């Protein structure tokens, strides 16, 4: 099941550490002094295993996404790896360099399946990932002063770098002069690293080793920078070739294949998405979406656009080519398939994500907002599957953050009735991710006074009460986080709606106060979430102001009467046995 684009949660970011091929968050090598050197190495790298979300869609960061998963039999994977493993070790032997026999030696080289012949793009991604892994591990061993391991891994790094350069040169077109210069610098630094680490093996004086360690760190940093520059140039060149192919093609099969390759690249992380946007990928894909002869390719092109627009550069390019107008045309045209309109909704959800500050300046979106919102509500109402409903509701949820007028539009379109009716349809609403979108819309609409009467009329208070009991089915971190968001937003919605005495009395009648007290006092009920606790305390205090008779004295004295921060501290420190 795909998960939707983010709608304003302070949700966790994607996998930390090494970016797919790009800049890593600043980590530090534990080498005394030379802070600049410590950080420079870890600014470049590839980690194919990070598997950033396909669309970078999350529920409020929306988890999102079609994950780029490779399900390959382990024996088959080992057979594919064997060629590169033996190649590397043979090169080490030819250079008369010993391979370490330390107990952790086998874990120092991690390889994915080998690229096919004549596939420069996959070759770059694979070799780049291997080299970045080696760089990271050399840094770790250097911090531990394990010089034998540092040296053997440096030799292996040189082998991989030489292989990447020679293999790419063999399958690529004429190399750029700039690439040749960087290749030369990279190999020089690799040789320098091997030589200096070999000398370190002969040194026993700690003071001398300390000074040499700084030199190794500096060399490693420069090597990482050259590697990153070379990889970016090579990937940019390959992306340019794909974009030109899409732009010039009038053959549906060629366009389908090339667009699929471009989509696969977007799954490798934000840095590659930036390159694709910069090199005209957004322009080329919207060109596809404006040609009737390519209508069957619209879903694939839109899916790729949604992934590219996870970065600001993609959104900028989308606005430059009037992409919002194109999306509005697709969403409002009933002749398009449901799948096409759902993918267009996914792009809307992505470009309106509150996590991208640039989306707040999409002036073109305001011009088409009414027809887009109307089309999305209709798509929610007619959705034939949970995935279609999820994408459409995620787009609506993000739009309610984007502009306050959207909430008034939704009220006029009877969106509350559409959403609440969908909650009883398991075919459309069957995951906490989808309920997260629904309760987000309700929470943002609840600031309008007219919303309360519609909620009561559609038995919405009972639905909100049910959301306070949202539980994960699988126990995965993403689903647990989604359930926490549902509980938190349900409490926020209840607190806002309880300004209306009728809503407050209905909530008390449905025992909402008892459930709120349970969430406050029992950490396991809220997965020990502080955000859920604060929201529940706020809702409980609002209800107590209208119907104080629904509280016992102990609950009033501990959860309502003190300052909010005092009640929070009391509940957050409670042991489970207290209940």
Curated annotation (Swiss-Prot):
The keyword Cytoplasm applies. A motif (PDZ-binding) lies at residues 576-579. Keywords: Cytoplasm, Developmental protein, Differentiation, Neurogenesis. It comes from the Eukaryota. One of its GO terms (molecular function) is cytoskeletal anchor activity. Transmembrane segments: none annotated. SUPFAM superfamilies: ARM repeat. Residues 74-89 are annotated as: Important for interaction with GPSM2. GO terms for cellular component: apical cortex; plasma membrane; protein-containing complex. GO terms for biological process: apical protein localization; asymmetric cell division; cell differentiation; nervous system development; regulation of asymmetric cell division; regulation of protein stability. InterPro entries: ARM-like, ARM-type_fold, Armadillo, Insc_C, INSC_LBD, INSC_LBD_sf, Inscuteable. Isoform 1 is expressed in various tissues with stronger expression in liver, kidney and small intestine. Isoform 2 is abundantly expressed in small intestine and to a lower extent in lung and pancreas. Disulfide bonds: none annotated. Changing residue 89 to R: Strongly reduces interaction with GPSM2. Abolishes interaction with GPSM2 and GPSM1. It is found in: Cytoplasm; Cytoplasm, Cell cortex. Its main location: cytoplasm. PANTHER family: INSCUTEABLE, PROTEIN INSCUTEABLE HOMOLOG. May function as an adapter linking the Par3 complex to the GPSM1/GPSM2 complex. Involved in spindle orientation during mitosis. May regulate cell proliferation and differentiation in the developing nervous system. May play a role in the asymmetric division of fibroblasts and participate in the process of stratification of the squamous epithelium. Interacts with ALS2CR19/PAR3B and F2RL2/PAR3. Interacts with GPSM1/AGS3 and GPSM2/LGN (via TPR repeat region). Identified in a complex with GPSM2 and F2RL2. This is Protein inscuteable homolog. It comes from Homo sapiens (Human). The gene is INSC.
